[in-house]
Amino acid sequence: MEEAIAELEGGYKAIGCASGMAAVHTLIAGMVKSGDHIVCSESVYGATSVLLSTIMPEFGVETTFVDSSEIEQVKNAIKPNTRMIYIETPGNPTLAITDLAAVEKIAKEKGIYFAIDNTFMSPILQKPFEFGADFIIHSMTKYLNGHADVVAGIIVVKTPEHYAILRKMSNHFGGVIDPFNSFLVHRGLKTLSLRVLRQQENAQKIAEFLENHPKIDNIQFPGLPSHPQYELAKRQQKGSGSMISIELKGGYEAGTKLMDNVKLFQLA
């Protein structure tokens, strides 16, 4: 399973973890030390935000959250002790797109690590190593497994040195994936391309329908020309993915009413 995902991402090797957050924590704990600083997308998975904003400061690691779709914010947040730039693109849940080539240039100039959470795209639609990433994170619970019967994560690395550090960290932290979940994820990989492309096709039709719906105030979907980074998404991604972010007219009350009445969707 690890070999298959490393090959899909074009990496050296991969480290399977017990969850997406086990992967994030292993990466941070392995590559960042007390006194270091991280620059992170503000539109990032909620548990990643909590880890970096409330838990890692207790271990001497500070994080600055920025709108990474505005590259100047990334550049201006760099400090002398910045050790890593951590990007999730498209953003979760705003679907804002970060210019990965521009971030890679900053990271290279400053000599700092560049990590990308590629969960929303999968290796089918985005190849972070082609844009200079040092590390790729996935929550395999989502697209990679694809059958809603596994909780798992993975880190993909480019170098033997980083692999040795993170494999040791994973083994001794204990957040390793078990053999049966590895088997299930490997099963899911066999249909990954078919699933991702069909989901994307369906999402495009749904987004086009919702864009002109009278009860929708705003919609963010990289496959719509109205998306602020539509052209960047076309250059950087091999597709728009299948995540859609909407804002309803009527705000929180309207959103609550909608979620209380949906039949197919549930809290992920």
Protein language model features and the residues they cover:
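Conserved PLP-enzyme active-site core in the AAT-like
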Residues: 14-215
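Short glycine-enriched loop/turn motifs at secondary-structure junctions
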Residues: 8-9, 147-150, 238-241
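A generic structural signal for nonpolar/aromatic side chains embedded in well-ordered alpha-helices
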Residues: 5, 166, 210, 258-259
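Short glycine-rich, polar/acidic loop-and-turn segments at beta strand-coil junctions
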Residues: 9, 18-21, 42, 223, ...
